[in-house]
Amino acid sequence: MNGVFLAIGALLPICLAGGALLGYAAVRFRVQGDPVAEQVNALLPQTQCGQCGYPGCKPYAEAIAAGDKINKCPPGGEATIRALADLLDLEPEPLDAAEETPPRVAYIREAECIGCTKCIQACPVDAIVGAARLMHTVIADECTGCDLCLEPCPVDCIEMREIPDDVRHWKWPQPSPRLIASDRERAA
């Protein structure tokens, strides 16, 4: 029993000194980040897809904090653009896609899937479920359409399909910017 107390007595001062040293180092050598970039990064979807032209969400957040446009994130969509506009006190802008494409989700042709799990490892939002050497499937509500699962698939059994319009993601058209007759009378 004395050996246990002796070991505790010997290790306790070493642990306390190590903890104090780590605490001091954390305060002394702290890396100051941009708080605006951290807040912007928290709003981005963290898919690391690169569709915005940056290698990941953190570099894009830093670019937004430095003044870049807030409308380059297709997986985040309009909800992210509105949240960023509210945070930065900017006007929301329409999504700046290279070409206007409808929302898409990944679809795995399960009969062709060999269960290699490479698509699961590539998916940044864990929208693909399955096990090794068994078929995989995509949870459509979780998929952001980032296309990162397509390239690693060795049998090309993954395709991107357009999401059909329904009430959950249908967008109302913007009203016409022209004045209506009653507004013209008041303006005159």
From Swiss-Prot:
Protein source organism: Pseudomonas aeruginosa (strain ATCC 15692 / DSM 22644 / CIP 104116 / JCM 14847 / LMG 12228 / 1C / PRS 101 / PAO1)
Protein's name according to its UniProt entry: Ion-translocating oxidoreductase complex subunit B
GO cellular component: plasma membrane
GO molecular function: 4 iron, 4 sulfur cluster binding; electron transfer activity; metal ion binding
A Pfam family assignment: Fer4_21
Keywords associated with the record: 4Fe-4S, Cell inner membrane, Cell membrane, Electron transport, Iron, Iron-sulfur, Membrane, Metal-binding, Repeat, Translocase, Transport
Enzyme Commission number(s) from the entry: 7.-.-.-
Function statement: Part of a membrane-bound complex that couples electron transfer with translocation of ions across the membrane.
Chief site of localization: membrane
Residues annotated to bind [4Fe-4S] cluster 1: 49, 52, 57, 73
Residue ranges of every copy of the 4Fe-4S domain listed in the record: 32-90
Source species taxonomy: Bacteria, Pseudomonadati, Pseudomonadota, Gammaproteobacteria, Pseudomonadales
Binding positions ([4Fe-4S] cluster 3): 123, 143, 146, 149
Cofactor(s) required, per the database record: [4Fe-4S] cluster
Subunit (UniProt): The complex is composed of six subunits: RnfA, RnfB, RnfC, RnfD, RnfE and RnfG.
InterPro entries: 4Fe-4S_dom, 4Fe4S_Fe-S-bd, 4Fe4S_Fe_S_CS, Elect_transpt_cplx_RnfB/RsxB, RnfB/RsxB_Proteobac, RnfB_subfamily
Gene: rnfB
Record keyword Electron transport present: yes
Similarity annotation: Belongs to the 4Fe4S bacterial-type ferredoxin family. RnfB subfamily.
GO biological process: electron transport chain
